From Swiss-Prot:
Assigned keywords, A-Z: Archaeal flagellum, Glycoprotein
Propeptide stretches in the record: 1-12
Pfam families: Arch_flagellin
InterPro entries attached to this UniProt entry: Flagellin/pilin_N_arc, Flagellin_arc
Official protein name in the record: Flagellin A
Intracellular or extracellular location(s): Archaeal flagellum
Gene field: flaA
Entry-listed glycosylation sites: N38, N175
Family, per entry: Belongs to the archaeal flagellin family.
Ion transport found in the keyword field: no
Main location per the UniProt record: other
Function field: Flagellin is the subunit protein which polymerizes to form the filaments of archaeal flagella.
Amino acid sequence: MKVKEFMNNKKGATGVGTLIVFIAMVLVAAVAASVLINTSGFLQQKASSTGTESTEQVSTGLKMFQTSGKLNEPIIDRLTIYVTPSPGSKPVDLKNTKLLMNRWTFQPPPVSYSSTYFENNNKQIFDVTGSKAWNNGAILPEYNFGVIVIQDDDGSCTAESPVIGKGDMAVITINCTNLDLAPRTRLNGYLQSEIGFKTQFTYILPNAYDKTEDVVILQ
C-alpha cells in the first residue's frame, strides 16, 4: 500500500515538474519573440530613416538655369547665377549654401548676410544703385555673395532666413573682379546646399566680348 502511494506521489511530482518546465519554455519563447519583434521594428524604423535621408541627399539641391556677367572692359567683374530648387527637392537655405569658383569659396556669414547682401526687389539685376545685394554700389566683398529674390509667393525667402522652395527663384550675386574673367577664360565650380548634391558647372567665356552689350550670358 505504501509502495503504491509512493508511486502515485512520484508521478504527481513528475507531472508538476514537467508542467513547470513547459511553462518556463513558453515564457522563454515569449521573451525571445518579443525581442525579435522589437529588433525587427527597430531595424525597420532605422531602414526607413536611412532611406529618407538617402532620398533627401539624392533629390535635394539647386538647379542653375542661367549665369550672366556684367562687362567692365576688359573683364567681367560681376556675376549673377539664377537658381531654383531642383525637381523634388526640399526647400534650400541659401544662407548655408557654399559656392566654389576657380578655387574660391564664397559663403555669406549669417550676420552680414542678413543686413547687407539681401534684396527683395525684382528690378534690374545689375543695377547696383541702392541694391543691398550689390552692397549699395560699393564693391561686394570677394568672399561673400548676395541674394536677389525673383519669385517667392509664400514669403519664405527673407533676409534672416533666405529659404527657397518649390516654384521660388533667386539670383546669387558675386563680385568676381579678382577672378580675371577675360575672354576665353575657363570658369568652373559648384554650388553645395547644406543637404543634398553638388550642382557643378563649367563655362568657357567667349573668344571676344561684344562691346555693344554690357551683359554676357555664359554658356
